[in-house]
From Swiss-Prot:
InterPro entries: PemK-like, Plasmid_toxin/cell-grow_inhib. It comes from Staphylococcus haemolyticus (strain JCSC1435). Keywords: Endonuclease, Hydrolase, Nuclease, RNA-binding, Toxin-antitoxin system. This is Endoribonuclease MazF. Forms a complex with MazE which is no longer active as an endoribonuclease. The gene is mazF. Toxic component of a type II toxin-antitoxin (TA) system. Ribosome-independent, sequence-specific endoribonuclease that cleaves mRNA, thus inhibiting protein synthesis and inducing bacterial stasis. It cuts between the first and nucleotides of 5'-UACAU-3' in single-stranded RNA. Neutralized by coexpression with cognate antitoxin MazE.
Length: 121
């Protein structure tokens, strides 16, 4: 069963513009009820092209701890809904501590607790 925090290889093509594409690792960020019953999953792209997290929506993951080819960064500004058929192979699972970092970066990316939101109402 697909679970929140799982890292899979997924085929993200076709893409447009600055979207992350090709077969690459993604982390499942959808809740487990959705993962169980929906034909789709919500994921965030992972890249190995950035050595360090550059912005608050980036979360670093270490290759040794998570059995990846290289140190990588989860891009929480690159969120996509995929059909489960795009998921190829489960690579690893992120720790609860790392998922807490993912949640914090998601909060920033989606502006869930953004003070600007309350000022505009």
């Amino acid at each position: 069963m697909i679970r929140r925090g799982d890292v899979y290889l997924a085929d993200l093509s076709p893409v447009q513009g600055s979207e992350q594409g090709g077969v690459r690792p993604v982390v499942i960020i959808q809740n487990d009820t959705g993962n169980k019953y929906s034909p789709t999953v919500i994921v965030a792209a992972i890249t190995g092209r950035i050595n360090k997290a550059k912005i608050p929506t980036h979360v670093e993951i270490e290759k040794k701890k998570y059995r990846l080819d290289k140190d990588s960064v989860i891009l929480l500004e690159q969120i996509r809904t995929l059909d489960k058929k795009r998921l190829k192979e489960k690579l690893t699972y992120l720790s609860d501590e790392k998922m807490q970092e993912v949640d914090e970066a998601l909060d920033i990316s989606l502006g869930l607790h953004d003070e600007v939101k309350t000022q505009n109402t």
